Amino acid sequence: MSFLKTSDPAVYNAIMQETTRLKETIDLIASENYTSKAVLEAQGSVFTNKYAEGYPGKRYYAGCEYADAVEELAIDRAKTLFHAEHANVQPHSGAQANMAAYFAMVKPGDTIMGLTLSHGGHLTHGSKVNFTGKLYHVIEYGLNAETERIDYDNLEKLAMEHRPRMIVTGASAYPRILDFERFRAICDKVDAKLMVDIAHIAGLVAAGLHPSPVPYADVVTSTSHKTLRGPRGGFILCKEQYAKAIDQAVFPVMQGGPLMQVVAAKAVAFQEAMQPGFVTYQKKTLENTQVMAEELRKLGLRLVSGGTDNHLVLVDLSPIGVNGYDAQLALRRAGIVINRNTVPFAENQTANVPAGIRLGCPAATSRGFGPAEIRQTVGWIGKVLKNIGNEDVEKQVLAEVIHLCRKFPVPGIDI
């Protein structure tokens, strides 16, 4: 970055500080990961300069022959990776992929169903503060209070009562496998479309370690980062019968020109996900997450639903008298990066000061952490949580975290 260092020292310094932060902290945010050097190079390529409104072979600008080539690569690889009939790789984010899917599948004012945000859903699945809650009539479904898993029987009851035009599934904080076959059956009973948001579990689905929604869903949306380890962006998969509607909803309805440098990086990430090593990585992520869950239980912490089937765990801190906000700050000071999170059915919590925290292993596993390092990390988490606000404990843990981190290079930066 010699040019940037000279031309804009302020931005250069911020990037260097972020690089140091990445190297010297343990990232347990379930929605974060490290991209490869190849993905970073593609995202910083000359495709940044190219406007390419439209689709391959149907652009509104000249000079798009190589943009066409790279987008076709991304499309073909996405279709192959997920066994889909059609793919659109232009959405700038997962939220915009979701927006396009809504615009293609339902009309403003239609009834939709989505998982309650406080039960693990996402803002774009019907939250009142989101466009979905403002444009559509939203019926929320939730978890069973005893099992803390999706209450499919009540979901079906609500669907029969309200007859939604579309049911949305997928989550941002749900640690269990989703039963796509059951969702499809419920949709068929009420003649509803099924939209599945796999942003969190896309890598697991691609690796064959989580059931794929593609055979059951009318439309599937996702991010290209998180467990997929690509650039920050979105994409959509759908049946061929919806291809035209989806493409039109992305462009010209929702977006203008695609970010071709990001599309190129998506193509690279999809190719990386087709390699045998990617499956090995996802298996290690699941193994590490199981180890994490077991170690958290040993500390006496309560896990929502009792455990996990995927890459994340949701921890209810209410029994130990700590809230998620204070836990997030204390752990950050100790070099462990997590996020606060609401807990289903918890009382006296808000989005800013929730009752729990969400932990995930995708980034730590990409860095090379195995069960031993996860056990060590959970031990530090326990020490910090049991000594909330103790600066001496936080400083001691931070020093140990930095010492461990120096043994594990950060993908895309060190290797």
From Swiss-Prot:
Q: Read off the PROSITE patterns from this record.
A: SHMT (PS00096)
What positions are marked as the site Plays an important role in substrate specificity? Answer: H225
Positions of (6S)-5,6,7,8-tetrahydrofolate binding: L117, G121, H122, L123
What are this entry's molecular-function GO terms? glycine hydroxymethyltransferase activity; pyridoxal phosphate binding
Main EC class of this protein?
Answer: transferase
Question: Which terms does the UniProt entry file under GO BP?
Answer: glycine biosynthetic process from serine; tetrahydrofolate interconversion
Give the UniProt keywords, A-Z: Amino-acid biosynthesis, Cytoplasm, One-carbon metabolism, Pyridoxal phosphate, Transferase
GO cellular component, alphabetical, reads: cytosol
Any keyword Nuclease? no
The UniProt record lists the EC number as: 2.1.2.1
This protein's source sits in the domain of life called Bacteria
Q: In which pathway does it act?
A: One-carbon metabolism; tetrahydrofolate interconversion; Amino-acid biosynthesis; glycine biosynthesis; glycine from L-serine: step 1/1
Assembly and partners are described as: Homodimer.
What is this protein's name?
Serine hydroxymethyltransferase
